[in-house]
Amino acid sequence: MARYFVDSNLVVYANDRRDPEKQARALEVLTQLMTAGNGVLSIQVLQEYANTALAKLEQEPQVVIRQIKLLDCLTTIAPSPASVRRTVEVRNTYRISFWDAAIVVAAEAGECDIILSEDLNAGQYY
């Protein structure tokens, strides 16, 4: 079964009522991944979601905490010194931002086949 890495924009859209169409699609994708058990995210994704939800979506802290708890069923990848070194390598090889490279490295660690992100080039292999 394919494994999918979830970037923070998908989690943000699932919690953003300002665009009901994007929200519905993001909720559909997250629900499928949660049900199938083939979703992966990273600590960075959780941090980016929490920051955006609190600052831009103006969600209450308890709502953000509850949403993060719901994501516990996805595999979570934590950074390590080795992953930071690998992030620097990926950044330099593919000429992408450090933070996008960190997503690529976390997806590698989670043995993901596909990264669900609007920040990276569609169809790009890393």
Q: What do these predicted ranges mean?
A:
Residues 1-41, 55-63:
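Short, well-structured N-terminal submotif of metal-dependent ribonuclease cores
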Residues 8, 100-101:
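Conserved glycosyltransferase catalytic-site signature
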Residues 18, 43-47, 69-93:
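Acidic catalytic patch
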Residues 28, 44, 48, 66, ...:
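Amphipathic alpha-helical interaction segments
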Residues 48-75:
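Active-site-proximal, substrate-binding regions of enzyme catalytic domains
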Residues 95-97:
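Beta-rich strand-turn-strand
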Residues 101-126:
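Acidic, metal-binding active-site segment of PIN/NYN-like and related structure-specific nucleases
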